[in-house]
Amino acid sequence: MFRPDQVHDVMKRHTIGDGEPIVIDFEKSFGTHLVDAKTGQPFLDCSSQFASMPLGWNHPKLKEKMESINLYAVHKIANSDYYSVPLAEFVHTFAGIAPDFNHFFFVEGGTLGVENALKAAFDWKMKKLGLSEADANSLDVVHLEQAFHGRSGYTLSLTNTFANKTALFPKFNWSRIKNPKIHFPLVESETTVVEELSLRQAEDALKTNRVAAIILETIQGEGGDNHFSSEYFAALRKMAFEYEAMLILDEVQTGVGLTGTTWAYEHHAGLRPDMIAFGKKAQVCGFASTTRIDEVPDNVFKQSSRINSTWGGNIIDMIRFTHIAQIMKEDDILNRVAIVGDYFLKQLLTVPRITNVRGKGLMLAFDLETPEARNAVLDNLLKRMTVLPCGERSIRLRPHLIFSMADVDEAIEIIKHAV
């Protein structure tokens, strides 16, 4: 067995080896703190494995519930074709937290969740129009500047955060529209002008009758933690109906409680997308669809193997999520996130120097003056806590959903010292 101080040498020998300097101590990490196995230092965890760990490290209830996984851990199950009781329990549980949707597809990886939502939309649009295979490459997807939807397959044509993630790979020239992100404190007139331009660009593309989907992150993550107005979502919703396109919201990062609601789109009254992509805190990735897809009788949920994968998600992840969902309900986690998140946001507003403080629930971010200033502050923060950069000069916080007021106070003390 390797020692903690050997880990990075091994990784650099066989892989790119550019991971974080921390080596996870699985035994000693606790609650909202990640412990470095090399030094024993605890770090306040405000990245939560890129927003994938809702209940923190070694949650006592989750540890107790997961003690029985040995029977399942020794098997790798092809869940798409071989069903089991844990699979059914997971699907039932997941459907319960997404009552707006009727069809579900599960897969490994958020990118593949987005990709299969796109495939479902392409299939639906082609059959709606009565088009042939010869017309397939004429389809379009409306998407935003600064979008991040993944880095393989169709998503390469959507992601446009940093060029090194998509450059030199073949891509489709799909319609990219202006980003009407809100700057805080809100200057409504400025936002409205950009929204109007963005919506005109979207409608121009939709008028070709070749747009299969409008896709956007409910709150953009890597692109800068960018928020959009309810009016903007409502306008896109109306256009998607009018021009027969699917409205797809990418909730891979925002979903399952991070914003204080199960899905971030719930913050926008009356908004109901046709599809959502999910992952991260859901432990299993995929997409969900409303019955709008049933306007085409032989849609992807009616044709065997039209979309599929060998594993259809991992059974251990499914068992874990079933327990996570139960604990979140028992402990009223969503209400906790809303309360603690509001406190966190207000405390961030007291920090000197940082600007554009923004957030919903525990999905929080702030800006520095320049990219160089951001990087310097980031380096200081990483000495005591885990955080993530985003956009050109932003820092994003992705705490575990069990974050407390005391954790917020600790975070604010670290941030004030770092800036």
Functional labels for PLM-detected ranges:
Residues 1-419:
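Conserved N-terminal phosphate-binding loop of PLP-dependent enzymes in the Aspartate aminotransferase
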